[in-house]
């Protein structure tokens, strides 16, 4: 049976409705290299909005990297996800990704694995650890790549509140802010599903990420904006 509506997951294309103003605003922020914080309760369409904007940006000199860090439990879990996502999204094919690892992370030997599903992407394990790379080196990786390739990178991190749940979280946040605030070829879109944690990270004056970027709060889509979609189905 065909589903007329999709619930509980990010959507694209004709299943994405309204958010016209938010889409235009976020697209402009991405194009102008602005840091953006998206805050809202669960299932308000943050991920779908970011995907929509990514699909609408046609400038080949802007690369949008999306990653979800929900299952990252430690600082170096995050660095491995961060680096792998950036290397994959700034490459056109797997072979180029591996070449970029050799070029930008020379002390690593990546491991590639494939899913049995024919349309699934490959996964890459980098093995980043305190023994081979410092946090600052990994956090500055996108700036190094962007300068080398002559592009601007927009890094979109979903479930960013996980950073606040990690051991020694405050030190991690200070390291991130300390590196990211000086980058000129990279901007960030940070969002998550736990509003109270995100609000504390970005709106608490005592926290390292206070005033890191423009904060946008997504509200529920109004009833009048739902009507055209419902009638069309």
Regions found by a protein language model. Give the residues of each.
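Conserved small helical "lid"/interfacial subdomain of P-loop NTPases
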Residues: 218-233
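Short regulatory helix/loop adjacent to the ATP-binding pocket of P-loop NTPases
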Residues: 195-213
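Conserved Walker B catalytic segment
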Residues: 124-194, 203
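Short, basic/glycine-rich phosphate-binding loops at helix/coil junctions
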Residues: 1-9, 113-124, 153, 209, ...
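Alpha-helical scaffold elements adjacent to nucleotide-binding pockets in ATP/GTP-utilizing enzyme cores
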Residues: 52-53, 78-85, 175, 197, ...
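Short glycine-/polar-rich loops that comprise or flank the Walker A/P-loop
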Residues: 60-64, 184-186, 211-214
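P-loop NTPase nucleotide-binding core
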Residues: 40-44, 48-153
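A short, basic N-terminal segment
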Residues: 1-36, 41
